[in-house]
A protein has these predicted regions:
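A short, N-terminal "cap"/entry segment at the start of jelly-roll beta-barrel domains
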Residues: 1-62, 70, 77-78
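Short, conserved beta-strand element in jelly-roll/cupin
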Residues: 82-96, 101-102, 110-121, 168-170
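Conserved metal-binding segment of the jelly-roll/cupin
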Residues: 129-151
């Protein structure tokens, strides 16, 4: 199941391989105020994204959006991936995420290999995560996940833009051992 928490508290997960350490360095750089990566993301216009290659088959989709102006079709939907593990880091803003095991979700659109995407029907009983700046959510192939949500407790952030980095890492690079 998904892993989430403050980036600073999850550092031990990246110590297993040199490639994961490269990923961790990128994520820390993105959060470092004033760094080139941090400024690149914070300077994105609303509703834009920029892709950055990280090597070893990894890449980051740096993006900004504001949910207040999102069309219904742009709001969160449940998805999972077969080839990549998602590392979603909030750089600025507050966003809600939902997650549920893929066995508890009904497939709406079958696997699209080109997009590495399975889309699911909405799930009413899913875990809800509040992600603020510095929070990292890691979603694996068995996690149907949806972002771009707001909970009642932080509705006041709805009009503020969200700046984030979504790193796609080939699942073969991830050595998950507790």
């Amino acid at each position: 199941m998904a892993i989430f928490g403050e980036l600073g508290s999850l550092g031990h997960l990246f110590k297993k391989t040199q490639v994961l350490e490269i990923l961790h360095e990128y994520l820390k750089d993105v959060m470092q105020k004033g760094s080139k990566a941090n400024q690149r993301i914070l300077n994105l216009a609303t509703n834009t994204e920029f892709q950055v290659p990280l090597g070893h088959g990894m890449f980051s989709i740096e993006q900004s959006y504001c949910l207040e102006h999102a069309k219904e079709s742009e709001k969160g939907f449940f998805e999972s991936h077969k080839k990549y593990v998602d590392f979603q880091l909030i750089v600025k803003g507050v966003e809600g995420a939902k997650a549920v095991g893929i066995n508890q979700a009904a497939i709406k659109n079958p696997y699209d290999e080109k997009r590495d995407l399975i889309v699911y029907e909405p799930v009413s009983e899913a875990s809800f995560l509040r992600l603020d700046a510095g929070m990292l959510a890691i979603f694996f192939e068995n996690d149907a996940h949806a972002l771009r949500f707001y909970g009642e407790s932080f509705e006041k952030y709805r009009a503020e833009p969200i700046f984030k980095a979504v790193v796609k890492a080939p699942k073969g690079l991830i050595k998950l051992k507790l």
